[in-house]
Amino acid sequence: MNIINLTPHAINFLREDNSVLATIEPSGMIARAAQTREAVGEVNGIVVNQCSYGAVTGLPDPQPETIYLVSALTAQACRDRSDVFITDDAVRDENGRIIGCKAIARI
């Protein structure tokens, strides 16, 4: 199975002992959901926006034996695609930074 990383970051998949099973480097393409925002009010001087997400750009057409890793926001915008996945079960270091994940998931 081909795994294509459509995010700007390398993704580490970790074993149960947190050793690295595989690292999927960025492909150089980034899939993104178009975003629109409209100011709808304010709270204590802070602007409140209404955001909506539309068409996805940068997502290749489905290919045999290929899955695509994208951001959760992008995956939500293309739920009809069975080949689009997000990282799941994040692992963090002692400072709270994500160092990898143990699974992938569909939205």
Describe each PLM feature range.
Residues 1-107:
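Catalytic phosphate/metal-binding cores of nucleic-acid and nucleotide-processing enzymes, i.e., regions
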